[in-house]
Each structure stands twice: as C-alpha cells, then as structure tokens.
From Swiss-Prot:
It comes from Bifidobacterium longum (strain DJO10A). GO terms for cellular component: cytoplasm. Its EC number is 5.3.1.16. NCBIfam families: hisA-trpF (TIGR01919). This is 1-(5-phosphoribosyl)-5-[(5-phosphoribosylamino)methylideneamino] imidazole-4-carboxamide isomerase. Pfam families: His_biosynth. Keywords: Amino-acid biosynthesis, Cytoplasm, Histidine biosynthesis, Isomerase. The gene is hisA. Pathway: Amino-acid biosynthesis; L-histidine biosynthesis; L-histidine from 5-phospho-alpha-D-ribose 1-diphosphate: step 4/9. One of its GO terms (biological process) is L-histidine biosynthetic process. It is found in: Cytoplasm. InterPro entries: Aldolase_TIM, His_biosynth, HisA/PriA_Actinobacteria, Isoase_HisA-like, Isoase_HisA-like_bact, RibuloseP-bd_barrel. It catalyses: 1-(5-phospho-beta-D-ribosyl)-5-[(5-phospho-beta-D-ribosylamino)methylideneamino]imidazole-4-carboxamide = 5-[(5-phospho-1-deoxy-D-ribulos-1-ylimino)methylamino]-1-(5-phospho-beta-D-ribosyl)imidazole-4-carboxamide.
Length: 241
C-alpha cells in the first residue's frame, strides 16, 4: 500500500517558517510561502499541507496569501488548509478558497457540537488535527491542554470523523523520528484514516510509517526534513510508492 505525502508550508507573518515543538518564537524563516509550495508541486507533490500559524496562535491571519496560493496552484495539487479553523467564518473561508480538505483542531476540543455538525455536513473534506503530548491533547497553537486523546477520539468517531492528523508535539520540528507507538494506538482504535505528522527525519521513518498502512495510516506530512534537506521529495515519494 502506498503512502500519500504532504509537504508542509507553515506561514507566519507572510513568510514560510518551521517551528520547533510548535513553539511561537522558535521559527526558522524559509522565505516565500508561494515559492515553497510551488517547489513541492514541481517536485511531484500531489498534496500540500498549508498552515496559517498566525491564525492558530491567534496573532492575526495570512488568509489572503493562503487563498492566493490555493488559487494559483489548486488546479495542480490538492491543498489541505490548517490553522485557526474553529468557526463557520474560518471554515467557510478555507473551503471557499478552494481547499480540498480543511483541518480543524482547537475547535474540536472547545466546541464539540459545532465540530459534529461540520463533520456531518462536509464528510471527508474535514479532518481533525490531534496534537498530542503523551495521551493529552494540546489546544490553541499547542499552548493549552485540551483533554484526553482517546476520550476525544471516541466522541469524534461517534459523529463520523473520517480522518485524524496526528502530531506528537514533542517530536514536531525536532528531526527525532516519529512516534510510531502513538500512531499505532490511534489507528488501532478507529476506522478513520490517519495522517502522521511530526518528527520524520529520514527515509527509514517513512518506511516505518508505511508499515502501518494496513491499520489505516495512509499519509504523512513532511516539514523540517524537506527544508533541512535530510532527503529530497523525489526520494521520499519513491519510498512511499
């Protein structure tokens, strides 16, 4: 079974950045978000994971810039939009921009009724981001705790969630390897598909994630590993086949 790869473009103050462990202020600047996204498309990406960090942290938004990226590249690549989607206005803006899929995070923890309604309405166009420390969820830009992972999943499964994007916060941007145990625990507890995020640092990490395909881990987000040139996207796509 093949693994779908989603190169990440995280946007802060109009620039493409990478954070360490999701902490505001830890970013490394990688220049133009549009150029970053275009680079991954030209290298063969079928999906881009596009994140508005300002919206996630509540420090403004980069909505116009993200909309422009979707508009310019959306006919060549599927775009998953993430960051600060927690109400009808932000969800509608993301969907109207042309995103193939939208990740909701904090909202799923703070407003379960709303989350249930959008999962019912939009189905597989909505994924829920589960940002985890241990078995505890981290909320709003990872600065607050949001309850037990498996209790939250039980609720989300009951309302028909079809995809989880699972990030081990301690691993994100640290190039220290993915949390295979966490991914296995999540995938074994749900019929939903699982996207792995955080910690991927070498091609063997992708091989390890690919072995979880039969229990429902069908995709992986690549961030720091690509920007730090640990491997090329072409090499990763070859492994993911």
């Amino acid at each position: 079974m093949s693994l779908t790869l989603l190169p990440a473009v995280d946007v802060r103050d109009g620039k493409a950045v990478r954070l360490r462990q999701g902490e505001s202020g830890s970013e490394t600047d990688y220049g133009s978000p549009f150029e970053a996204a275009r680079t991954w498309v030209e290298a063969g990406a079928e999906w881009i994971h596009l994140v508005d960090l300002d919206a996630a942290f509540g420090t403004g938004n980069n909505r116009d810039q993200l909309r422009e990226i979707v508009h310019e590249l959306g006919d060549r690549v599927n775009i998953e939009l993430s960051g600060g989607v927690r109400d009808d206005a932000s969800l509608d803006a993301a969907l109207e921009a042309g995103a193939a899929r939208v990740n909701i995070g904090t909202a799923a923890l703070e407003n379960p009724d709303w989350t249930a309604s959008v999962i019912k309405k939009y189905g597989d166009r909505v994924a829920v981001g589960l940002d985890v420390r241990g078995h505890t969820l981290a909320a709003r830009g990872w600065t607050r705790e949001g309850g037990d992972l498996f209790e939250t999943m039980k609720f989300l499964d009951s309302v028909g969630c079809l995809r989880y994007v699972v990030t081990d916060v301690a691993k994100d941007g640290m190039m220290s390897g993915p949390n295979i145990q966490l991914l296995s625990e999540v995938a074994e507890r749900t019929d939903a598909k699982v996207t792995a995020s955080g910690g991927i640092s070498k091609l063997d990490d992708l091989r390890a994630i690919k072995e979880l395909a039969e229990i429902g881990v069908d995709s992986a987000i690549l961030g720091k590993s690509l920007y730090a040139r640990a491997f090329t996207l072409q090499e990763a796509l070859e492994v993911a086949k």
